[in-house]
């Protein structure tokens, strides 16, 4: 109760709660072990240069380091990815219809902007080629990142294994024999870290929607977290990956409107009794994609305890692919923090 009066006093005095530090991350940091697989083949006709060199695309390993650093920052040190192995896979992965690019055919297709359709990668072939289920079951890894060229056909994220559910894409089929579940991320190294954070944001939306799927509206804190002014006038909270509190349409992070929002409440979760205040685009980067996503992720609850049967540390669900209705292995058996 005292916190509510304190926040109200700050509002009257013009001391915005947004300038106040969020609560520290609860408990021991999560340290998921990542297998990173890079498809960046050399092209013989181009002097053996790799795709990134030929087309001036980003360094995959540098992208991965910045992505991990960004997530560590916006989780208040709570999510610390550990890249335990990197595989340079110097070939083009198989597509679902059996097609596979050669180095020469890919370069010519990209230059002509005539890429193969259908585009989708064969995930079952990828899981088998890199023995992903075996690595997971031997407790070597907790997550997989594929860093690939444009039109490799990867989903932004997908899930593998027993109890797998929608993770911005359907689960990888025929993997239910896996003793647990894990997430595969797909990143396009033509693009930047902003897009990688967008992938993680949609993963967040999928997992937290699943966690709260059986909660009645009054107890659905995920639905509350994602409100924005267009759908909840005067009652916006943090919005979602595509919609900031003031956005009028997808990707409209730079909308100049000023709207009332209760986004600051999430810095003091589970106390959500704040008075709200007027907010505008400069708080989340003025339209910059990466800055918006960092701002949004920093508002995710990350404290001890539980509310209505859901952990108050939502990062646990995101890092562990946890599902309160269909538990896989106990969390203590899966993360590198317990080695």
Q: What label would you give each PLM region?
A:
Residues 2-21:
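Intrinsically disordered, low-structural-confidence terminal and linker regions
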Residues 20-134, 155-156:
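Propeptide-to-catalytic entry region of secreted or membrane-anchored zinc metalloproteases
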Residues 35-36, 143-147, 183:
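Structural recognition of the beta-strand scaffold that forms the well-ordered cores
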Residues 38-41, 147-151, 187-188, 206:
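Active-site-proximal beta-strand/loop segments in catalytic clefts of secreted hydrolases
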Residues 133-173:
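Auxiliary, metal-adjacent structural segments of Zn-dependent hydrolase domains
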Residues 168-189, 295:
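Flexible, surface-exposed loop/gating regions in the mature catalytic domains
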Residues 190-210:
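Active-site recognition of the HExxH zinc-binding catalytic motif
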């Amino acid at each position: 109760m005292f916190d509510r009066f304190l926040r109200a006093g700050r509002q009257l005095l013009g001391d915005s709660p947004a300038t106040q530090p969020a609560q520290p991350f609860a408990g021991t940091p999560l340290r998921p072990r990542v297998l990173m697989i890079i498809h960046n083949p050399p092209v013989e006709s181009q002097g053996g240069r790799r795709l990134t060199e030929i087309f001036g695309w980003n360094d995959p390993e540098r992208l991965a380091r910045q992505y991990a650093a960004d997530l560590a920052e916006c989780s208040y040190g709570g999510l610390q990815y550990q890249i335990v192995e990197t595989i340079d896979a110097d070939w083009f992965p198989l597509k679902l219809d059996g097609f596979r690019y050669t180095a020469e055919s890919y370069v010519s297709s990209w230059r002509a902007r005539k890429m193969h359709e259908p585009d989708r990668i064969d995930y079952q072939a990828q899981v088998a080629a890199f023995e992903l289920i075996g690595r997971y079951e031997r407790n070597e890894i907790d997550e997989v990142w594929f860093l690939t060229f444009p039109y490799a056909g990867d989903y932004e994220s997908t899930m593998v294994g027993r109890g797998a559910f929608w993770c911005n894409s359907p689960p990888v089929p025929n993997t239910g024999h896996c003793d647990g579940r894990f997430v595969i991320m797909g990143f396009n190294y033509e693009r930047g870290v902003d897009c990688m954070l967008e992938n993680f944001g949609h993963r967040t939306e999928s997992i937290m929607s699943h966690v709260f799927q059986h909660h009645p509206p009054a107890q659905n804190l995920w639905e509350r977290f994602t409100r924005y002014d267009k759908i909840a006038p005067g009652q916006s909270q943090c919005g979602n990956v595509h919609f900031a509190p003031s956005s009028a349409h997808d990707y409209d992070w730079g909308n100049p409107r000023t709207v009332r929002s209760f986004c600051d409440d999430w810095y003091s979760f589970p106390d959500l009794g704040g008075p709200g205040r007027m907010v505008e685009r400069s708080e989340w980067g003025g339209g910059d994609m990466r800055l918006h996503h960092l701002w949004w992720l920093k508002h995710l609850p990350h404290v001890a305890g539980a509310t209505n049967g859901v952990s108050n540390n939502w990062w646990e669900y995101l890092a562990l692919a946890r599902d309160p209705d269909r538990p896989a292995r106990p969390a203590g058996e899966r993360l590198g923090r317990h080695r």
